[in-house]
Amino acid sequence: ELLSEINR
């Protein structure tokens, strides 16, 4: 979730 947002 957290990394998913950073990787956007």
UniProtKB/Swiss-Prot annotation:
Keywords: Chaperone, Cytoplasm, Stress response
GO cellular component: cytoplasm
Highest taxon of source: Eukaryota
Main subcellular localisation: cytoplasm
Protein localization: Cytoplasm
Stated role: Putative molecular chaperone that may promote the maturation, structural maintenance and proper regulation of specific target proteins.
Subunit and partners: Homodimer.
Family recorded in the similarity comment: Belongs to the heat shock protein 90 family.
Annotated protein name in UniProt: Putative heat shock protein 2
UniProt source species: Pseudotsuga menziesii
